[in-house]
Every structure is written in C-alpha cells, then in structure tokens.
C-alpha cells in the first residue's frame, strides 16, 4: 500500500509481497470469522432529483468526450483550459475572439460538470433514507457491538445511536472515545474515514456502510473491522445502495469476487428479526454508468 511519506518503498525493498490471501480463503481456513454481507437496495421517492443531476452531468461530460481526467483538470486548472482551447482553435493567434469564446465555453462545461458530479454524490451520500434504515438496524442490534461508515461526518452525526469518532475532535478526545468503545461489550461507533484501516477493535460483529466508492481495497478494509476471529461469531455487513444511481456500479466494482445477499428495505426487517425471506436477484438497473 502506498504511503504519502514514501516509506512504502522500504517495505517493497526489504519485505516484498511473496503471497496474497484474500478474505474468502482466510475465512475458509478459519483465520477470520464468517460473515454475511447484505446489499440493501433502496428505492427512493425523490429519484427524479438525481436523474436531473445525472442528465446535466452527462451533458457536460460529453463535451470532454467522456474523459474524466480532462474534465476534472479543466474544472480546477486554467492552464488546462487554455491548452484545450488551443487544440480546439488551432489558429488561436489570428482568431483571438474565437479562442476567447471557446475558452469560456470550456469553463462553463467544466464548472457544470463538477457541480453535477458533486450534486450526485451529495444525493447518494446524504440521503435521509440511509439514516432511517441505519437506525432500524441499530435498534435491532442493541445487544451487539456495531460500527457505521458514512462518507461524511455530517451524516455520521445524524445517526440516532452511539458516539461519533471524527477529525473534528481533539486527538486526546478521539483516543478516549476509541478506547472506551474498545472496552465496551456492546454499543455503536459512527465514523467517516478514520477507521477504514488499521483499527483493531475487539468484539465488533455488525457493520453498516452508508457511503462508499468503487475501491475494493476500502471495502475489504471495512469488512475487516468486523471479521476478526472470535468464537461462534457470524458477522453482518449491511451496505446501502440506492437503486437507479451510480452507486450500483460502485458496489459492483468494490465487491467484485465477494459473496453477498441482495435484499430491499422491505426484506430488511425480516433479516433483523430472524424471519425467512427471499433474496432478490443480483440484477443491476439497466443504465450505462461511466462515472
């Protein structure tokens, strides 16, 4: 894993990777506790808001020929916009007005692209239905030790159970919050990104993932928080996915190769109360997802 300080180079030099063991193999060998992941497919009443943002997103994205790196660069760097404008107007030295108009057009599309991109993310990450279902899960698992993963601290603070561990706290208070939770037998700790990796918390058996992206590494690290080996433990992971959004594609990419059970919000209560239910077929909404 790369580090910002570059010290991963020492690991590569003196202790290179000689073998890899994935979660499935480690579980089969008994090194980790077994777990069930539930993909909770959520249908929301206000999906039209997302679809409008999505339409706007692709309108602007197409201007950049669906080149995500180019679109993002033009949104943040004026030099990149000038560079693109010169490509679109090769005779820019003799056509200054045309060059200026093209540069302005690039800026409009770049800002619109970024605005729609952030709008889609906000819709997905902050949807109140996720808070509602999280509280339902935690209400039914008050005899367990649970952790939630939100994309933002703001969402984590809205959850009705447990404490929040965030970068807003002082380091001392954060350590105290974490140590108290480690010592507890049951309870809830709500986090954003602080415990994605490197945290060893005994007794965890339930994870609720409200916000994620397409990274398989982050997904594996979060699951890893609740599958540390313990006798007679079967961990539960609930991952929320809003139907009809790019979150379906993020889930597919982040969960590739892993087993999961698809349910909807109507099945969730059956799962929580131990009743029989019929899993949904693992079919994605038929949409073209680029980003």
Language-model segment annotations:
Residues 1-37:
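Post-DEXD/H (motif II) to motif III coupling segment of the RecA-like Helicase ATP-binding lobe
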Residues 14-17, 32-37, 202-206, 231-237:
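Short glycine-/polar-rich loops that comprise or flank the Walker A/P-loop
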Residues 32-110:
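Inter-lobe connector of SF1/SF2 helicase motors
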Residues 225-255:
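Conserved segment of the helicase C-terminal RecA-like domain
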